[in-house]
Amino acid sequence: MSAVALPRVSGGHDEHGHLEEFRTDPIGLMQRVRDECGDVGTFQLAGKQVVLLSGSHANEFFFRAGDDDLDQAKAYPFMTPIFGEGVVFDASPERRKEMLHNAALRGEQMKGHAATIEDQVRRMIADWGEAGEIDLLDFFAELTIYTSSACLIGKKFRDQLDGRFAKLYHELERGTDPLAYVDPYLPIESFRRRDEARNGLVALVADIMNGRIANPPTDKSDRDMLDVLIAVKAETGTPRFSADEITGMFISMMFAGHHTSSGTASWTLIELMRHRDAYAAVIDELDELYGDGRSVSFHALRQIPQLENVLKETLRLHPPLIILMRVAKGEFEVQGHRIHEGDLVAASPAISNRIPEDFPDPHDFVPARYEQPRQEDLLNRWTWIPFGAGRHRCVGAAFAIMQIKAIFSVLLREYEFEMAQPPESYRNDHSKMVVQLAQPACVRYRRRTGV
């Protein structure tokens, strides 16, 4: 049977196709693709055709494909100005795999990371006092800068950071406008601020580097990743890496883990506050669990079922990445439809995670869907995809889950939280490829008593 033409979603008659709709309501656009076209449909993103896959069979093709067939590098033009040339998304598949196999994410390191995360949380809340109010985006974005830098680069580097690094990093993430598919260097405000923020981060890292060079560590045990990179020499005997290159490496190492953990932590707390029965169950679970006197570094690596189910349901409803992109490097057929070389091929956690045939009452918050016998995450391995799936499952998934468990093992045992604005007012800002919580996103806290 010969392949049939790819169906195209309605609309998109402007010069850049569906780009403006993708900038303003990407989830609405992608849901319309599924509703009108089924598991395989297309929309137009500037000069590129995007083949959006959804549903189990189409997603399986997407997640099983290797880099030789579907390549990430050219699918994210907005990343090169952020990372710099030659870093991760601008590198070859082999180099990316080498970079992403970060020793810090290996299992034997996790216990130390859990203790580090607990320490960072306690430092962040040290001046909270008995009661107050925070903005979730501000708080968790700064906290996860400190946790990710401490765990992935080293506590020594983290201790030389302050709130400036977090603010600049946030501005960098705001520079991921889909207009990058037209030109990632367009003279628009968010790209100008992106470039200024990156220059600011390079200046901060260069300042730290200069201090390290002036006072090199005398003891090997006192070295972190920055010291190691500074010490690497080229054949000429000069430093192998510039401050710009090292900053790019650090940005790339922290990038996926930072915004995913920040957003997921925020939404986990929002959903707990929206659903007081789930909140009470998690509090009871944590109080009983930590009643044995053991540390966060012990329990965060073990099962915390109620909290984990809340986390899974939060990830299903609010996936930190709403679309995953690749570029087709050959001709392929998916469910009778032909994909051509050069096409952008996409999968959408935001759409697949809410397919009603796989997830009954898909828009409802139901942590029990992960309990036996339902286990909807395991049953639907190609549509429960907040971390991707198959060979492209996120390398940091275990770290991300452990981090959230460690964060809430501290926060929920120390403080009670309640919403400071209407429940429906908490929402994501989808105007950028890196999804952020929209502000304001305020909550009130009060120290727990009698614990």
Curated annotation (Swiss-Prot):
The molecular function terms of the Gene Ontology recorded here are:
heme binding; iron ion binding; oxidoreductase activity; sterol 14-demethylase activity
Query: One biological-process term from Gene Ontology?
Result: sterol biosynthetic process
Any idea where this protein resides? Cytoplasm
Q: Which GO terms describe its cellular component?
A: cytosol
Report the principal subcellular site: cytoplasm
Required cofactor names: heme b
Q: How is its activity regulated?
A: Inhibited by alpha-ethyl-N-4-pyridinyl-benzeneacetamide (EPBA) and 4,4'-dihydroxybenzophenone (DHBP).
> What domain of life does the UniProt record list for this protein's source?
Bacteria
Pfam families (alphabetical): p450
Q: What are the UniProt keywords, alphabetically?
A: Cytoplasm, Heme, Iron, Lipid biosynthesis, Lipid metabolism, Metal-binding, Monooxygenase, Oxidoreductase, Steroid biosynthesis, Steroid metabolism, Sterol biosynthesis, Sterol metabolism
InterPro entries per UniProt:
CYP450_sterol_14alpha_dmase (IPR050529), Cyt_P450 (IPR001128), Cyt_P450_CS (IPR017972), Cyt_P450_E_grp-IV (IPR002403), Cyt_P450_sf (IPR036396)
Catalytic activity reads: a 14alpha-methyl steroid + 6 reduced [2Fe-2S]-[ferredoxin] + 3 O2 + 5 H(+) = a Delta(14) steroid + formate + 6 oxidized [2Fe-2S]-[ferredoxin] + 4 H2O
Matching entries from SUPFAM superfamilies are given as:
Cytochrome P450
Q: Which EC number(s) does the record attach to this protein?
A: 1.14.15.36
Which residues are heme b-binding? 72, 76, 97, 326, 392, 394
* Subunit field text: Homodimer.
Sorted alphabetically, which PANTHER family does this protein's record hold?
Answer: 24-HYDROXYCHOLESTEROL 7-ALPHA-HYDROXYLASE (PTHR24304:SF2), CYTOCHROME P450 FAMILY 7 (PTHR24304)
The family this protein is said to belong to: Belongs to the cytochrome P450 family.
Q: Write out the function statement from the record.
A: Sterol 14alpha-demethylase whose physiological substrate is not known. Accepts electrons from the iron-sulfur ferredoxin Fdx encoded by an adjacent gene. In vitro, catalyzes C14-demethylation of lanosterol, 24,25-dihydrolanosterol and obtusifoliol, to produce the 8,14-dienes stereoselectively.
This chain's protein is named Sterol 14alpha-demethylase
Record organism: Mycobacterium tuberculosis (strain ATCC 25618 / H37Rv)
